[in-house]
């Protein structure tokens, strides 16, 4: 069942690329269908990921929500960095 779900997702991404390339839609989308498809497929393969919100303890930048970095605001060598803008 899991393999079938994955194949359906891949087919959906490929069909979306095909439609975007052949449609008269946005030129930006026409120029970058492969890049978009690659990022989307990569996200689908990783699955749903919870991000760490602002001002919550973190260990590295990748776990923070978008536009946030894992850093300290008080001292450079702190032991408890948090996700901050």
Swiss-Prot record:
Residues 1-23 form the signal peptide. The modification Pyrrolidone carboxylic acid is found at residue 50. Contains 4 disulfide bonds. Its main location: secreted. InterPro entries: Conotoxin (IPR004214). Expressed by the venom duct. The keyword Disulfide bond applies. GO terms for cellular component: extracellular region. Keywords: Disulfide bond, Pyrrolidone carboxylic acid, Secreted, Signal, Toxin. Residues 24-49 form a propeptide. It is found in: Secreted. The cysteine framework is XV (C-C-CC-C-C-C-C). This is Conotoxin Cap15b. The lineage of its organism: Eukaryota, Metazoa, Spiralia, Lophotrochozoa, Mollusca.
């Amino acid at each position: 069942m899991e393999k079938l779900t994955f194949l359906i997702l891949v087919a959906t991404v490929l069909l979306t690329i095909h439609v975007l390339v052949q449609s008269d839609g946005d030129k930006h989308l026409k120029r970058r269908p492969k890049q978009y498809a690659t990022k989307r497929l990569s996200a689908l393969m990783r699955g749903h990921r919870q991000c760490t919100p602002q001002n919550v303890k973190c260990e590295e930048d990748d776990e923070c929500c978008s536009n946030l970095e894992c850093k300290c605001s008080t001292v450079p060598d702190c032991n408890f960095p948090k996700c901050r803008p």
